[in-house]
Amino acid sequence: MASIAYLGPAGTFTEGALLQMTDAGMVPQRGGGDWRPLPVDSTTAALDAVRDGAADFACVPIENSIDGSIMPTLDSLAIGTPLQVFAELTLDVAFSIAVKPGRTAAEVRTLAAFPVAAAQVRQWLAAHLPAAELRPAISNADAAQQVADGLVDAAVSSPLAATHRGLSTLAEGVVDEANACTRFVLVGRPGPPPARTGADRTSVVLRIDNAPGALVSTLAEFGMRGIDLTRIESRPTRTELGTYVFFLDCVGHIDDDAVAEALKALHQRCTDVRYLGSWPTGAVAGAPPPPSDDAARWLAGLRGGAADGSAR
């Protein structure tokens, strides 16, 4: 039975994303078709559980539409034993303001919130609960648990976490920006990537020599092959001031010839290339890499003795 670590306790948005992934059959089969949830107290702990062998996979948030990338996830993927992404799911996110039954907004003096959640409802809180003292929580479910335990008056929480703990809500669908969403990924130990679907994402972490034009030359390996880069982000190496690694996402799969050629070029050009995987996205988000069949046939023609590269 496969085990999947996730940011717990029960009722987090991460658990909701994990349930949707498993229902959709997005989890690779390891040890049979059943799986066991393993709630942990941070995204870093979830990824470390995979590295340590305590879990087969981890479901972790990697990006949200309000604040961008989830830095603890990126930093953990960039260092330590390599891990690989096998699936992703984007979840619409809206929060509930959870309280004990019978409590009113006028009685709310303290409010618990996971920092990522607090950032997404900052304007709403300023308008509706301006006097509430904000207290940290390690997850949306933990915020709800603090209400249930009587530690705070209210919580910014997921609807699922509030329901699990028998709480009422002062407001539902709370979010500063309409259509807010979070992208979650399923991460495991390295293995064969999911099959190419035509709507795929490939991600790498690069260490590049500190030399003039090094980054431009690296990015050119994608541009010259018609590969659409969808994310470029730098993070400190944590080993020396002023040194960085670069996260790059592109449209395409390692089995696309253009992407494969770019990866080979990166291996030759960069100090280090960490392959984070190629996996389906469900929908094409950008321009897919161009097919190289025509070029391959032309080259085969030349090898066969045709002066113009035409097949003989």
Where are these regions (language model features)?
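Domain-level signature for soluble enzymes in the chorismate/prephenate branch of the shikimate pathway
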Residues: M1-R312
